[in-house]
Amino acid sequence: MNSGIRQLEIRDSEGAAPFPAVVQYPTTESSAGTTLGPYHFDATRDAAPAAGRFPVCVISHGGGGSHLLYRSIGTHLAASGYVIVSPEHPGDNRNDRSRSNTDRAALDRPRHAARAIDAVLADPVLGPVADASRVCAVGHSMGGYTALALVGGQPWSRSGQPIPTRADPRVRAAVLLAPSTDWFLAPRSLADVSVPLLVIAGERDHVTSPETIRQALAGLPTGTSVTLDVVPGAGHYSFLTPFPAHMRRPDFPPSTDPDGFDRAGFHVELPRRIEAFLTQALAPR
């Protein structure tokens, strides 16, 4: 199969302005390629979905980032039989950072992800092929925070107060890529997390260090299935799909990696690793 691609407008349940999302999904149509902004997707715009019922995966981008930066993961998973929805978080994206690094962003982000799942399931084209019994989440950096809150993590504010997020019981597995876990260091922050987790950290990540991630994961309940992989030589931004050549420069950190790290090669293996984990985690109970 190949990947189709559509753009959706997501309605926020709190009455705020709608926000955009990109959806990739399985199709049997040949790949024509689609350009969104400066980025190329190996996906056919508005292609007919393949017949069947496919797991739904929400991908949450990092703080101040973009929902267009995880193309390698989204395209691979869609072609492998997943419906992928990647929302742009209002107030915490590349064009609007008014809520970045705030408790408000921490409160809102899990709701945005849940509304994105709702939108796919309710869509007249995608809903019939989306399997509501197999839902998962992938998140990078602050998106990893989002995914962890979705599966029951209780975040705490910098001032020491619980942030009243809501878990989404539909989400049965989560992949956390260089996740922001300092929100979950208070006692029992992860006491209600029971779904399988795949956590992938960068050895040379100085933004969300493997040490802080390990400290937070130590709070998971005994028996929770968690795998922590530390990628040798990887930095914080190594989890972003390689940027087009004209965007790669030393003064644009998201396009750079620690010396010697092969981001292009990593993004051949990373989507496969994620797919293997999700296939097992979402297998029929």
PLM regions and their residue ranges:
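Domain-level recognition of soluble alpha/beta enzyme cores
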Residues: 1-58, 69, 79, 165, ...
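Short substrate-entry loop that stabilizes the transition state in hydrolases
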Residues: 30-31, 46-54, 59-96, 206-210
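Cap/lid segment of the alpha/beta-hydrolase catalytic domain
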Residues: 35-38, 64, 68-71, 88-108, ...
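Alpha/beta-hydrolase active-site loop
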Residues: 102-132
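Gly/Ala-rich beta-loop-alpha elbow adjacent to hydrolase catalytic centers
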Residues: 139-143, 147
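Acidic catalytic loop of the alpha/beta-hydrolase fold
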Residues: 182, 204-208, 236-237
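Short alpha-helix in the alpha/beta-hydrolase fold that links the catalytic acid
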Residues: 189, 195, 209-219, 243
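Short beta-strand/loop motif that positions the catalytic acidic residue
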Residues: 193, 199-201
